[in-house]
Amino acid sequence: MAENGKTVQVTQIASVIGRKPGQAETITGLGLRGIGSTRTLEDTPAVRGMIRKVAHLIKVEG
């Protein structure tokens, strides 16, 4: 868990087909495997940066 104990839930809502390679790699780095895939991640600056990079492809809760 994160030091502050907070988590964030991310869900992929759009495909990475036709996107820049860096965006596809970021989605994979978040642990998402396809549309509808959901992961609960630690709320860290690194994760927040990845979320910002692909915000148009995911839905964030928490």
Curated annotation (Swiss-Prot):
GO terms for molecular function: structural constituent of ribosome. HAMAP family: Ribosomal_uL30_B. The keyword Ribosomal protein applies. NCBIfam families: rpmD_bact (TIGR01308). The keyword RNA-binding does not apply. One of its GO terms (cellular component) is cytosolic large ribosomal subunit. Belongs to the universal ribosomal protein uL30 family. Part of the 50S ribosomal subunit. The lineage of its organism: Bacteria, Pseudomonadati, Pseudomonadota, Alphaproteobacteria, Acetobacterales. It comes from the Bacteria. It comes from Gluconobacter oxydans (strain 621H). Keywords: Ribonucleoprotein, Ribosomal protein. GO terms for biological process: translation. This is Large ribosomal subunit protein uL30.
